[in-house]
Amino acid sequence: LFNEITRRNLDLTWDATNGVIASSCTDEVIAAAAESGCIAINIGMESGNREILKSVRKPGTLENFLGAAEVLRRHEQIHASVFLMVGFPGETMSMILDTINVAREMDLDWYRCAQLQPLPGTPIYDAMAAQGIIQETGDKELRFNGGAFGKQAEIEQGLRLATADFREAFANIPMDAVPTPDQLTDIWFFMNYHLNFHRIFHERNQVKMDQLIAHLNVLADVISPENGFSIYFLGYLEYLKSGSISPELVARLEQRLDTSPFWRDRFEAFGLSAEHLKDLNFPEDETQPLQLLSTNKAAPVSAGLG
């Protein structure tokens, strides 16, 4: 199919953001997809822990996911994303750290982080309800996650307001402990920032920067206009590309922080400020990505494969 699209010179672009099977991402297939106009692919990994993958009967393996990522990194014109979930029944902090470490080793463009919210009546829902991870509710009361920012509106409405120092947020949680629902929300937020936004400080590939600008414009204008991180890092990328930032974008961020205690707390915790955009002066110490949930440098996951 891809070769025929190319042969006919249809001059179109397409994406597979609903998800592809990792094992199908071979050099031959992805090269043909890119040539035919593919601009985005999403891999539905969910977890980077072997035990969790087995428990949810996920057909993909860590080898599949890392192999697919290696292929996709060779095709920079494809914006490659990964779907991650936290909050599986019995999932410990150590298992979540496995997911974070595999995601980091994949080193792709975006991670769609979400908390597991199963449908009532399913085995996984019953298991989570029995463990107290979720409360049994009627269908009308069940909250669905709208993606990477699906929780933000819920948090900001006062249903979840975490104000802890996020740089030390998980230091006192035992690695063999199953996080509480409140802790899971903090973990979800923290993962989303460090796997997606913080790494933008280190991006210098022009193709990837353009992809991120397009992605953040959609987030800031359509999907989650209230999200302060989207506005801040859109401004940062504008600065890298042109040496300036539009006054309108600066005003949007100032308005967001002025009206939202939630975002003021988060920006303070992560060392971010609207003044960075106004002064065109960003943190100078952003040279290495922060380690998550561990003070020790984790060995590459691939070192333990096979």
What spans do the regions from the language model cover?
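A structural motif corresponding to the C-terminal lobe/cap of the Radical SAM core domain
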Residues: 6-222, 244-258, 275-288
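"A position-specific structural signal for the A-helix of alpha-solenoid helical repeats
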Residues: 85, 233, 266-270
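Catalytic-core helical/loop segments in enzymes performing group transfer/polymerization on anionic/lipid-linked
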Residues: 227-228, 234, 254-257
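TPR/TPR-like alpha-solenoid helical repeat scaffolds
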Residues: 263-304
